[in-house]
């Protein structure tokens, strides 16, 4: 039995956005189930006692968006540098966890494009309601949904993740948008 691809991401991660635009085709090409796994990247960094948002380090930040613009152009993915980075993604991630498995992929794409293409504030309730619906946003304050995000982040920690995007196939971890070719080769039995 073939393991599914588990795609761990946070909406705040621009590299996860780029990966989200390619992962479905990669999974389909390899006849693998794709499981979307939203989690809180800041919570992961905190649990690992890692510096928050490595991309924001003063010596790295000037290069970050140049790199992203190049990558997006190279892969033909729409991308605009947002006016605010990072944005808080707790509420949007909770909204995603309140959706069904079937609703999740399209909602992820809507939220990513709103942030990384349209420069919309996905942490704003009105914007979020427009993207995923009032009912979904209302659920973000429920104890069950809050607990689900904590559990999703704990799972990322417990399974050895250290950043996003991360891909797990069984126990094989592939970290980063730039490792998707290696993930593809692994799924084809070449690695």
Stretch-by-stretch model annotation:
Residues 3-6, 16-32, 106, 110-191:
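C-terminal cap of thioredoxin/glutaredoxin-like
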């Amino acid at each position: 039995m073939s393991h599914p691809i588990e795609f761990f991401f946070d909406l705040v991660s621009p590299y996860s956005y780029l990966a989200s635009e390619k992962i479905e085709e990669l999974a389909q090409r390899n006849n693998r189930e794709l499981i979307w796994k939203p989690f809180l990247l800041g919570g992961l960094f905190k649990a690992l006692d890692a510096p928050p948002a490595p991309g924001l380090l003063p010596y790295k930040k000037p290069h970050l968006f140049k790199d992203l613009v190049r990558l997006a152009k190279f892969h033909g993915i729409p991308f605009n540098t947002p006016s605010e980075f990072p944005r808080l993604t707790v509420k949007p991630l909770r909204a995603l966890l309140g959706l069904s498995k079937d609703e999740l992929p399209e909602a992820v794409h809507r939220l990513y494009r709103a942030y990384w293409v349209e420069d919309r504030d996905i942490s704003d309730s009105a914007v979020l309601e427009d993207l995923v619906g009032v009912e979904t946003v209302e659920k973000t304050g429920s104890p069950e949904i809050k607990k689900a995000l904590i559990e999703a982040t704990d799972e990322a920690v417990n399974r050895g993740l250290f950043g996003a995007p991360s891909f797990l196939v069984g126990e094989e971890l592939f970290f980063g948008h730039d490792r998707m070719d290696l993930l593809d080769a692994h799924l084809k039995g070449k690695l």
